[in-house]
Amino acid sequence: MKMHISLKFLCAGLLIYVAVFAFITPLSPALLQTNLTEIKPGTHTFELVGYNSHFQSAGSNALYLINDSTLSIPCTVTQVADESHLTAEVILPNEMHSKAFAFVLNNDVDGTVFLETPLKVTDFTMNPDLARTAMPQFQHREAQFFNYPYQPIIMETIRNLMWHVPMWFTMFVLMIISFAQSIKVLMRGQRGGDDLLMPIQPERVRPHDNKAAMSAAVGLVFCVLGLITGSIWARFTWGTWWTRDPQLNGALVVFIVYASYFILRNAVTQEENKWKLSAIYNIFAFILMVVLLMILPRFTEGLHPGKSGNPAFSQYDLDSSLRTIFYPATFGFILLGYWMYHLRLRILKIEQAHENLLA
């Protein structure tokens, strides 16, 4: 069955949409760093660096040190150097409720942004009964433009989410097709109940064997792409091209297992034995892939999202702005993989027909 032309246009449209918006969409404004890490009571002047911020064009910037939703210490912005650099002053009293504070800034363009790194205060008097100064009720609005969420470690590499993860989803879909076709090979292409010792009927089995092999071949391509994009992502977030993470090692094992599937197919020359052995091997390869990539990571600790205590696709991994690109990317790559599978299958059929003519 050929892939309908409308699905091909849909695939191309989705991938063009993803390629454009995955790169042109900016990250949300954030506070990147300050030259203060630890201060004492008194008057302090400090610098604050923003990321994708609009300190200058916003006009007015409200800056506070906060401990919780009921306590704040106002800071005075003394100079705005440019869109991402400002200088401010804060006066810390001798008596306070807490020793840990965080910066929060609000303006009309960036909305409300926070500095994740806490500011530690020393040499002060702890007074839990001190009257609290409520934080001003400014509007906690979002930035005025569409953006991706800012995450301190991932930062701009969050765009790789639109490529890395959909490639693995595509691989899974193709391997499911290969798994199902391998089962049909063992069933002789009929509706079950056949004795496995009965002679194989080539006209019933060969189409399913072709589909199993070609879907696994294209799936292996996306496995390699997933490993490459994952390694690049790891380099910029974890500081290394590869780490001893259970899911990363499991993905590499999956690649080796499926690469061995094609070595097995090429090693067996007798067609009937090749069909049987390849189908049995492919079924076990799929089960191993599920165990290594979907089951074991849930019970082990590691850096990769999806581990115990580090869930994938949580509210921190995938917000509404990311979903508008991620879901089309996933569907688009799955369509691309399915399209490649059909093309590879047609090429194989032509090659086999040519061989039959020469025989």
Regions found by a protein language model. Name each.
Residues 2-32, 115-359:
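Polytopic transmembrane helical bundles with strong interfacial aromatic enrichment
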